[in-house]
């Protein structure tokens, strides 16, 4: 089967119109790499967008007014995200003096503010640094006396908007039998915690298998499990793969660690398969977010999936082809699955394939 035929076949298998709109938008992003157009689509598609990076800050500063430092592409994206979330933007700032000439004094309808004026007249406002290389601007702001507590640095210089309840949106907890949850790529344990909340507490699940190979994340996971009082967790400190092995691993500690090669990796890790760990046992729900190893992990879970048809929530954004290759493989494992696709953020990350 050719690639185009496979892409169209997966499109036809998607079970609702939202899934098809997401599929089309992601395909266009893969082909054209137009992040701004994708952002515009996301904002038009979803009306419940929130900005998680600002939520903790706004608990302490409920009337925050924002100034964007950086009028390039990231600043333009940040402006659209803030407005879609209902935030108050009062101006923008940039070190490029040419942007302040004549008609360019206004950016996206907001006034331009000279960098030197921030510390003098705007120290009660909040500056969001909206450039990739944020450290020099942060240092510039601190040196001019701008309060550190009113400076927000977005991850990778890109403010992120999101919506929905990722991994759980399309599923209802089965109250007739207890859930058995597999969290492959549990990072900080928060998804496991969300699962417990979703299913209604420890009376409604039998067991949780949590896989995480990144040693720098183990303490976070265990702390999350302990604070939330999560019981019956089998914490597997290994990566998921199609078999038991030892592989090169590139660790970040930020939820984006991944299998690498000898040249790029900074350590070696043990990996195993879901079928090996469950050893013929049941799973009712499998979540996979394993930074590009989703297909190998599915191959290593094929017996569990064939035998028990668990609910599946699979990340399909780490590799462009995963969106159709993973869907095709899931259909081969169990043709009775109904497939849905959802996207959760204003960037290309966090596209989830659901199989029910």
Predicted regions and their residues:
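Phosphate/nucleotide-binding beta-alpha loop and adjacent structural elements of enzyme active sites
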Residues: 1-65, 69, 73-90, 95-356
């Amino acid at each position: 089967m050719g690639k185009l035929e496979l892409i169209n076949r997966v499109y036809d298998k998607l079970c609702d119109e939202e899934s098809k709109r997401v599929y089309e938008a992601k395909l266009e992003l893969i082909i054209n790499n137009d992040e701004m157009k994708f952002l515009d689509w996301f904002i038009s598609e979803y009306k419940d967008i929130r900005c998680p990076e600002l939520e903790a800050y706004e608990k302490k500063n409920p009337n925050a007014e924002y100034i964007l430092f950086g009028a390039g592409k990231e600043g333009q994206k940040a402006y659209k995200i803030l407005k879609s979330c209902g935030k108050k933007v009062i101006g923008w700032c940039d070190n490029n003096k040419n942007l302040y000439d004549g008609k360019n004094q206004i950016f996206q309808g907001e006034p331009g503010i000279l960098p030197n004026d921030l510390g003098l007249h705007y120290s009660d406002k909040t500056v969001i640094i909206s450039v990739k290389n944020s450290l020099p601007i942060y240092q510039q702001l601190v040196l001019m006396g701008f309060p550190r507590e009113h400076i927000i640095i977005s991850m990778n210089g890109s403010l992120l908007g999101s919506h929905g309840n990722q991994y759980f949106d399309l599923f209802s907890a089965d109250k007739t039998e207890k859930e058995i949850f597999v969290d492959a790529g549990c990072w900080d344990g928060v998804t496991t915690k969300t699962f417990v909340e979703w299913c209604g507490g420890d009376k409604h699940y039998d067991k949780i298998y949590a896989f995480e190979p990144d040693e720098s994340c183990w303490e976070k996971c265990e702390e999350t499990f302990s604070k939330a009082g999560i019981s019956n967790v089998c914490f597997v400190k290994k990566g998921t793969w199609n078999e038991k092995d030892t592989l090169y691993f590139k660790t970040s500690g930020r939820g984006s660690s991944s299998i690498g090669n000898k040249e790029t990796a900074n350590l070696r890790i043990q990996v195993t398969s879901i079928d090996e760990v469950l050893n013929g046992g049941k799973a009712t729900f499998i979540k996979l977010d394993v930074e590009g190893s989703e297909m190998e992990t599915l191959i290593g879970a094929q017996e569990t999936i064939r035998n028990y048809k668990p609910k599946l929530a699979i990340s399909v954004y780490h590799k462009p082809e995963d969106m159709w290759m993973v869907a095709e493989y899931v259909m081969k494992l169990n043709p009775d699955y109904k497939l849905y696709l959802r996207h959760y953020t204003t960037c290309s990350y966090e596209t989830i394939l659901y199989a029910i």
